[in-house]
Structure formats: C-alpha cells, structure tokens
From Swiss-Prot:
Upper lineage: Bacteria, Pseudomonadati, Spirochaetota, Spirochaetia, Spirochaetales
Functional note: Endonuclease that specifically degrades the RNA of RNA-DNA hybrids.
The organism of origin for this protein: Borrelia duttonii (strain Ly)
Locations listed in the record: Cytoplasm
Domain RNase H type-2: 1-181
Annotated signal sequence range: none
HAMAP family: RNase_HII_B (MF_00052_B)
Gene: rnhB
A Gene Ontology molecular function term of the record: RNA-DNA hybrid ribonuclease activity
Biological processes annotated in GO: DNA replication, removal of RNA primer; mismatch repair
Family named by the database record: Belongs to the RNase HII family.
Matches recorded under SUPFAM superfamilies: Ribonuclease H-like (SSF53098)
Protein name per the record: Ribonuclease HII
C-alpha cells in the first residue's frame, strides 16, 4: 500500500494549516483526472474530492494558528502530516510526502518528493481533499467574520484581506507570527 500526504494553507495568514493522508483502496478509474489542487477549478476539485473520499482510506489533521505561531509554519506543516498519517492507522509499504522534508512518521519506507502533488496520484489526491476540506472551513469562518472576505481569499494575504485587517483589526484566528499588513 502507498500513502500520499500533502498539506494546504501554508501561505495563509488566517486559520490552520491542514494535511491529508490518502491510501487508495484499489486503483480507481479516475486517476488520469487527478492533478495538483492548485491547477484544478473549484468545481473539478469538489468533484474529484467526492470520488477520492469514496475510493480511499483518508485522514485529516489541522494545526491551529496558535500552534503555528509557537512552532513556526514549517514545523506545524510537518506535524499536521505526521498526525494525518497516524490517524489513518494503516501500515503502508511506502509513504510519499509532498515537498522536500520528511515528517516524523514510522513507516517501512518514506520519501519526500518535490512537486509530488503534480506527479504522484496519492499525493495529488491528498492535495485535492485537503484543499476542499480547508476551503469549506474558510467558508464557515466567513459566516462568522464576513468583513474579512474569507470565502473568497481562503485566508491568504490578498490585498482585500490585508485592507480588512487594517480597517477592522486582527482576529484571534490570524497568524500573529506572519506579516499581516
């Protein structure tokens, strides 16, 4: 079994970093449609996410902005990946992680693959379901904090988001260790 792991929200200034771990139950027929979540439309991501969730074992883990501020985004991303894999509770022959750093994971074999979210099906799948999951969370936060445009900016440091911070102030879910304005 091969497990793919990826994270989303690393460059955001609001909310958690979120990771997903994915193991396909069998080889699904939609693998040729997978790609890095950043290259797919919202509609395509949501469509593929539903297919992935039906055809894979998966787990999510998120690390809050408070912990990000304490341990930094790099360590928080690795921790989210580690926890997502542990939550799967399935032993894999090979764990493939997007990026160049390896989280603390007990596995027979583990490799970090730069641009893995564009090359490895399991990492592509993790990228997609993680992005859809975090985007849904941002839509929910937008209902609570409508002045910050989270439904649109998804917590990223857009001009509108930074202008909202200048006008309305920093929220408890903003990452204080990041350049906010």
């Amino acid at each position: 079994m091969i497990c793919g792991i990826d994270e989303v929200g690393r460059g955001c200034i609001f909310g958690p970093v979120l990771s997903a771990a994915v193991i396909f139950k069998s080889k699904p027929n939609f693998l040729n449609e997978l790609d890095d979540s950043k290259k797919l439309t919202k509609t395509k991501r949501e469509y593929l996410s539903a297919l992935i969730l039906e055809n894979a074992y998966y787990a999510f883990a998120d690390i809050s902005n408070e912990i990000i501020d304490k341990i930094n985004i790099h360590n928080a991303s690795l921790l989210a990946m580690q926890i997502a894999y542990q939550k799967l509770n399935i032993e894999c022959n090979l764990v493939l992680v997007d990026g160049k750093f390896i989280p603390k994971i007990q596995a027979k074999q583990i490799r970090a693959i730069i641009k893995g979210d564009s090359m490895i099906d399991e990492i592509k799948a993790a990228s997609i379901i993680a992005k859809v999951q975090r985007d849904k969370l941002m839509v929910e936060y937008d209902k609570i904090y409508p002045l910050y445009g989270l439904k649109k900016n998804k917590g990223y440091p857009t001009k509108e988001h930074k202008d909202a911070i200048k006008k309305h102030g920093i929220l408890s879910l903003h990452r204080k260790s990041f350049q906010l304005i």
